[in-house]
């Protein structure tokens, strides 16, 4: 019986698998094309908007020599009442090697994994999980800090509604980082992690900051009269960081001068674009591992 691998959340990967994937991803940073997925088909189906995740998955497939088909949800039969399960069953009948799915409802990728015979990759489900984002964030931190064990990171912003925060809290904590949550009470989840409502309280002790977007689309009612009100307390500025050696991350899209100010986005300590670059490489490693089924390896074969 062939084992079908899925990536629904970060806990699907062992410590050794994560290390192997990140090592492999670093080899892909040369942007060279390979033939690992030659003759393989990957379908992307995103029920929520995406720029970085969707594009990087599709680029990852092509750099591995595979074929990718994007299902345009706005023109698909889901608009005619077809259930997502019927959609998945029909896509599965076309024999893809993997389906990458994003959905507003938590749990959808896990359900699809039980109704298809190909690998399912979670490209983000509601406020639940975004495993490949956490993997690329870990790679970015390792490349920026040298090592992450024993280091401290402050996650700042709309944590309660953030799938990125959920996945990073699990993965970074597993690799020995102390995760500190910074948010107003209405953005703070129930947790045993250390919490503060002002970044200034911990700025002198953290090695990295992860700023998060305020996810207004997941709020039932407006929380702030204006995002400027939020920014006055939580925007990451050069004045706040001073000359501290702190790596600054953000999963995107960035609300300029709300999450991070213009000057800080141009600062070399800001790793936002490095995250995007690392994202393609990480997704290459994930897709190769799930589809080929062999363990992540440091040795990357060059295309012929």
From Swiss-Prot:
Transmembrane region(s): none
This enzyme catalyses: carbamoyl phosphate + L-aspartate = N-carbamoyl-L-aspartate + phosphate + H(+)
Its Gene Ontology cellular component terms are:
cytosol
| Gene3D superfamilies in UniProt | Aspartate/ornithine carbamoyltransferase (3.40.50.1370)
* Family matches, as InterPro entries: Asp/Orn_carbamoyltranf_P-bd, Asp/Orn_carbamoylTrfase, Asp/Orn_carbamoylTrfase_sf, Asp_carbamoyltransf, Asp_carbamoyltransf_Asp/Orn-bd
EC main class here is transferase
EC?
Answer: 2.1.3.2
**Residue stretches in coiled coil:** none
User: Which amino acid positions bind L-aspartate, per UniProt?
Assistant: 80, 163, 213
Tell me the NCBIfam families matching this sequence: asp_carb_tr, PRK00856.1
Protein family (similarity comment): Belongs to the aspartate/ornithine carbamoyltransferase superfamily. ATCase family.
Protein name (Swiss-Prot/TrEMBL): Aspartate carbamoyltransferase catalytic subunit
Lineage, highest ranks first: Bacteria, Pseudomonadati, Campylobacterota, Epsilonproteobacteria, Campylobacterales
Q: Which gene encodes it?
A: pyrB
């Amino acid at each position: 019986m062939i084992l079908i691998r899925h990536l629904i959340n970060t806990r699907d990967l062992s410590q050794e698998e994560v290390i192997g994937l990140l090592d492999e991803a670093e080899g892909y940073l040369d942007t060279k094309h390979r033939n690992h997925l030659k003759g393989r088909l990957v379908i992307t189906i995103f029920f929520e908007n995406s720029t970085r995740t969707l594009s990087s998955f599709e680029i990852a497939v092509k750099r591995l020599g595979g074929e990718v088909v994007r299902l345009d949800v706005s023109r698909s039969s889901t608009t005619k009442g077809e259930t997502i399960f019927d959609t998945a069953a029909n896509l599965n009948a076309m024999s893809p090697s993997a389906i990458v799915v994003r959905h507003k409802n938590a749990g959808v990728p896990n359900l699809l994994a039980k109704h298809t015979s190909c690998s399912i990759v979670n490209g983000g489900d509601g406020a639940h999980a975004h495993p490949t984002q956490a993997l690329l964030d870990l790679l970015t931190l390792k490349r920026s800090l040298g090592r992450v064990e024993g280091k401290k990171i402050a996650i700042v912003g709309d944590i309660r509604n953030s799938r990125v925060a959920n996945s990073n809290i699990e993965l970074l904590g597993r690799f020995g980082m102390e995760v500190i949550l910074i948010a107003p009470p209405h953005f703070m989840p129930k947790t045993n992690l250390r919490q503060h409502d002002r970044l200034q309280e911990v700025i002198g002790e953290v090695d990295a900051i992860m700023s998060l977007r305020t996810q207004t689309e997941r709020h039932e009612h407006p929380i702030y009269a204006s995002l400027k009100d939020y920014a006055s307390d939580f925007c990451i500025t050069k004045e706040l960081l001073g000359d501290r050696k702190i790596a600054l991350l953000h999963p995107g899209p960035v609300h300029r001068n709300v999450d991070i100010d213009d000057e800080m986005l141009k600062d070399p300590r800001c790793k936002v674009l490095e995250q995007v670059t690392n994202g393609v490489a990480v997704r290459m490693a994930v897709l190769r591992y799930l589809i080929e089924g062999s363990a992540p390896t440091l040795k990357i074969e060059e295309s012929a």
